[in-house]
Amino acid sequence: MCIRDRPLSIKKKIISSSLLRKYLQSGRLNNVNKLLNRKWSIDGKVQKGRQLGKKIGFPTANIDIKNYVLAKPGVYAVKAKKIKSSKYIKGIANLGYRPTFNGKKILLEVHLFNFSGNLYNKYLRVEFLKFIRAEKKFKNVDQLKKQIKIDLVTAKKTK
């Protein structure tokens, strides 16, 4: 058995939960993923939402995120899987308040590419691959849809 007598560090920077939180909350996802040596992820139960994504052509799985230290609000390239599965599906996620719809509560909404099916009450693991952009309030739903299409192209190119 090996017992470490010094804190873990990389390039003279001590890796701590405080440092990881700081990086997460400032949008430095690449740093977090490097320090963890894996993709930062959230596991949660899919809950029924207001169906806003579905109404505008981008159905989402709304993930319960209470009890998590969260990343900077914004749009992310992600991949997700059911907890007991090994098959990941790429997608895009909005972590935030949905300012175009005057949202008050922070939500994680995940749109999975080439997926159809019912995920309600299933548990998903969502791995965050890349920060795409900060959350923004759009003047109308058409502007939001136009931006989502641009974000989808970026997310699909993410490895």
Which residue stretches match the model-derived regions?
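Anionic-ligand-binding alpha/beta catalytic cores of soluble enzymes and soluble regulatory domains
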Residues: L8, K13-A61
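Short, small-residue-biased leader/transition segments that mark boundaries at the very start
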Residues: M1-I3
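Phosphate/ribose-recognition catalytic cores of enzymes acting on nucleotide-derived substrates
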Residues: D5, K48-K159
